[in-house]
């Protein structure tokens, strides 16, 4: 059961659309791999205990897969045994952090994504995703419990900040011209900042090509697909609202609660003399510190203020664990999808040169190319001088890659939604006003993300280091060309269907 969104595009827009879609997906997945390799490497550098747990977590997932699929152990028993081992691994990792450089982690993660993409899905991907579900529910459950215990606190974050902010938000390096200008307008550049699974082209590829094939019944698609998006929306809302609502201004939170907020942050590595608001922290630190502060503020009402710092440090680490677990999920899944897209792109070659086709589409060859290209983009740290202070600042690759990845991902979502709109027209035969329920948001999303990527290409890309101009800049340019080609095919097909 189930076909990929690329196959659906062929059915409603023609064979050319399928190959254009496949090429777009493949290039987009390169940016996904590069961005998440960089993010994961930075998380492991800043939280070495998360690195240790992740290193242990993978063999445990392999162990679970072997128990269930090779030795026939019941899932409930295998789950119980593996979860106990994971809990033991958590305590072990707290005492034995793994210290490696950012560059070393980038190489290790690239090799991991290569290995995971080539292995059978039951061997690592499926068991690890299954075990991650327990971590997700624990993460969300703690967040929900926290929101209940802190509902009486006054909101810290402002309802409105600014419609336009510095170009640094969308990847401009400190000291460059776009970083000094308020050119990052909320519309249309918000999809270059927020790359959430609640609106994600990457997820459309996973859902249509992988998840759909695992459904027992087509009727389950509504519960699994729509239910997953509702859950993802809830998670994204908690991730954004809870830390900002509770911990926007550190001094204000300390004054309102009487808790040692500033001391806790200092012990967690935050320079509170310079960083007074959570928005001033980097993306990863914003997430981990915000989650830690929110949970510590809530649980200190149960365990007392004396435990505040320990609770904060513990749940800051827990947030890093959760983040790294889902980043690794993205890495191996993205590379596996890139491998499939690569193979499908060359299926026309099978009848013309079978030997060449076999070499190009070999599972290990197809699994190696994307992480190698991603590693080239993710590997370097860029050292820049902040003009205002003269301080030397090391900028991780994801700061520059994230807007490019985010934009291509959201544009893929728009293209998938437009393909879905044509499917509604062709297959379901839906006409009239109700058809605009899918067509209107798809067109608005396409216009928004296309405009945002053009802005990034014009205003940000020329000021990036040469590597990112040649790498991310070229990928975005190619993606926009493919985007225009697909929208032309969409218009042509839509006219035929009307």
Regions found by a protein language model. Give the residues of each.
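Hydrophobic alpha-helical segments and their helix-loop junctions in multi-pass secondary transporters
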Residues: 65-70, 74, 84-107, 115-117, ...
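C-terminal membrane-solvent junction of multi-pass transporters and transport-like membrane proteins
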Residues: 47-54, 64-85, 101-102, 131-132, ...
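Selective recognition of specific alpha-helical transmembrane segments in multi-pass small-molecule
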Residues: 25, 30-34, 84-85, 89, ...
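Extracellular/periplasmic helix-exit of transmembrane alpha-helices
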Residues: 147-176, 230-293, 333, 378-391
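Hydrophobic, membrane-embedded alpha-helices of multi-pass small-molecule transporters
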Residues: 102-119, 145-153, 176-216, 224-226, ...
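Loop-to-transmembrane helix boundary motifs in multi-pass membrane proteins
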Residues: 12-30, 227-234, 287, 309-319, ...
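Flexible loop linkers connecting adjacent transmembrane helices
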Residues: 1-17, 210-220, 224, 250-265, ...
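Helix-loop-helix module between adjacent transmembrane segments
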Residues: 1, 5-78, 86-105, 195-200, ...
């Amino acid at each position: 059961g189930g076909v990929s969104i690329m196959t659906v595009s062929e059915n409603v827009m023609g064979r050319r659309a399928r190959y254009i879609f496949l090429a777009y997906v493949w290039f987009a997945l390169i940016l996904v791999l590069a961005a998440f390799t960089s993010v994961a490497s930075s998380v492991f550098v800043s939280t070495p205990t998360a690195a240790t747990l992740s290193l242990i977590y993978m063999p445990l997932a392999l162990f679970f897969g072997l128990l269930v699929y090779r030795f026939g152990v019941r899932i409930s028993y295998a789950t119980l045994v593996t979860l106990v081992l994971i809990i033991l691994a958590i305590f072990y990792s707290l005492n034995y952090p793994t210290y490696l450089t950012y560059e070393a982690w980038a190489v290790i993660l690239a090799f991991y994504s290569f290995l995971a993409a080539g292995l059978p899905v039951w061997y690592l991907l499926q068991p690890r995703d299954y075990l991650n579900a327990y971590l997700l529910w624990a993460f969300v459950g703690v967040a929900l419990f926290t929101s209940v215990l802190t509902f009486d606190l006054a909101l810290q974050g402002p309802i409105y900040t600014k419609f336009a902010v510095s170009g640094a938000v969308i990847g401009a390096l400190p000291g460059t011209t776009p970083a000094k200008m308020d050119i990052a307008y909320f519309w249309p550049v918000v999809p270059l900042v927020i790359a959430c699974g609640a609106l994600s082209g990457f997820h459309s590829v996973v859902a249509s090509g992988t998840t759909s094939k695992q459904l027992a019944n087509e009727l389950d698609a509504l519960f699994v697909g729509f239910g997953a998006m509702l859950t993802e929306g809830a998670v994204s809302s908690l991730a954004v609202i809870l830390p900002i609502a509770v911990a926007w201004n550190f001094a204000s939170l300390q004054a309102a609660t009487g808790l040692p907020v500033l001391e806790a942050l200092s012990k967690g590595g935050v320079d509170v003399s310079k960083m007074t608001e959570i928005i001033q922290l980097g993306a990863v630190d914003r997430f981990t510190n915000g989650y830690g502060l929110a949970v510590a503020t809530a649980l200190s009402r149960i365990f007392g203020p004396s435990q505040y710092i320990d609770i904060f440090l513990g749940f800051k680490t827990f947030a890093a664990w959760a983040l790294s677990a889902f980043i690794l999920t993205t890495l191996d899944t993205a590379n596996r999808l890139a491998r499939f897209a690569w193979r499908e792109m060359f299926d026309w070659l099978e009848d013309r040169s079978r030997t060449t086709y076999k070499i190009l589409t070999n599972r290990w060859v197809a699994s190696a190319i994307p992480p190698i290209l991603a590693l080239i983009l993710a590997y370097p740290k860029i050292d820049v001088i902040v003009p205002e202070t003269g301080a030397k600042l090391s900028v991780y690759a994801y700061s520059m890659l994230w807007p490019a990845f985010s934009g291509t991902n959201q544009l893929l979502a728009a293209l998938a939604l437009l393909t879905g709109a044509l499917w509604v027209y062709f297959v379901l035969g839906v006409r009239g006003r109700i058809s605009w329920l899918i067509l209107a948001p798809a067109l608005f999303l396409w216009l928004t993300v296309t405009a945002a990527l053009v802005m990034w290409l014009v205003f940000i890309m020329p000021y990036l280091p040469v590597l990112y101009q040649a790498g991310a800049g070229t990928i975005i340019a190619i993606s926009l060309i493919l985007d225009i080609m697909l929208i032309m095919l969409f218009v042509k097909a839509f006219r035929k269907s009307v």
